[in-house]
């Protein structure tokens, strides 16, 4: 009925919330097709991050009525500006650790996991790591941190490593690996992929940008050197 009137804009307020999973997937594909066909600007309100990522050309992430970040879905996923945004987007959710930076080295517990050339004041911080942002490191040399294996789950092409670490803000965290990997040890060393982890201020939870993992150009922000 709304489309018959040929409006300049459509507002859809959680239209799929009462549908079952299969129908919801089909309907969001149809909504996307109709929007592209008609060219009508559409505001789609949802609490489902998968809907937001799959349907939208641009995402606005809100918290308590305040805008946290706006941008293309992949830009927001790849470079969250706030810890809330990082935790909202992604399934499985991003892993968050209590950490610190000292003399440019980033620590989880007592182990250095990365070193940045960006001048950042020594401070406690949150280190958020995407599940796909870690690899099992065989060598004991170099950066990385050790974790205790809780479960190994093979799901088709992916292997989910469920592990524990005292610095993690939850009881366990997940690491997504290729299913052709064989994990038999009870404790492993994990190394970080440079573009799959993010640093956040411990008080404000705002992103601390480093040159090894800067803000995308589309955000219109320059690399932040946090000298206090």
Locations of regions flagged by a protein language model:
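Secondary-structure boundary/capping signal
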Residues: 39-42, 84, 93, 171, ...
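Residues that scaffold the ATP/ADP-binding catalytic core of kinase and kinase-like folds
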Residues: 26, 79, 87-88, 137, ...
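Non-catalytic connector elements of ABC transporters
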Residues: 105-228
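Generic secondary-structure boundary/loop-capping signal
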Residues: 20-22, 50, 67, 73-74, ...
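C-terminal boundary and immediately downstream tail of ABC-type ATPase nucleotide-binding domains
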Residues: 78-101, 128
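ABC ATPase nucleotide-binding domains
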Residues: 1-84
């Amino acid at each position: 009925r709304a489309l018959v009137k040929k409006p300049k804009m459509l507002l859809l307020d959680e239209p799929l919330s009462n549908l079952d999973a299969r129908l919801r997937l089909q309907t969001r594909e149809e909504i996307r097709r109709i929007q592209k066909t008609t060219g009508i600007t559409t505001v789609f309100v949802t609490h489902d991050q998968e809907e937001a990522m799959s349907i939208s050309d641009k995402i606005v992430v809100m918290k308590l009525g305040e805008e946290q970040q706006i941008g293309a879905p992949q830009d927001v996923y790849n470079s969250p500006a706030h810890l809330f945004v990082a935790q909202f987007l992604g399934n499985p959710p991003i892993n968050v650790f209590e950490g610190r930076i000292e003399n440019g080295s980033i620590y989880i517990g007592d182990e250095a996991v990365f070193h940045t050339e960006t001048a950042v004041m020594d401070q406690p911080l949150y280190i958020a790591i995407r599940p796909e942002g870690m690899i099992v490191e065989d060598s004991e040399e170099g950066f990385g941190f050790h974790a205790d294996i809780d479960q190994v789950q093979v799901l088709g092409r992916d292997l989910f490593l469920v592990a524990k670490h005292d610095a993690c803000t939850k009881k366990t965290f997940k690491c997504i690996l290729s299913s052709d990997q064989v994990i038999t040890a009870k404790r492993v060393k994990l190394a970080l992929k440079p573009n799959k982890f993010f640093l956040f201020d411990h008080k404000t939870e705002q992103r601390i940008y480093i040159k090894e993992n800067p803000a995308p150009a589309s955000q219109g922000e320059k690399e932040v050197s946090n000298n206090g």
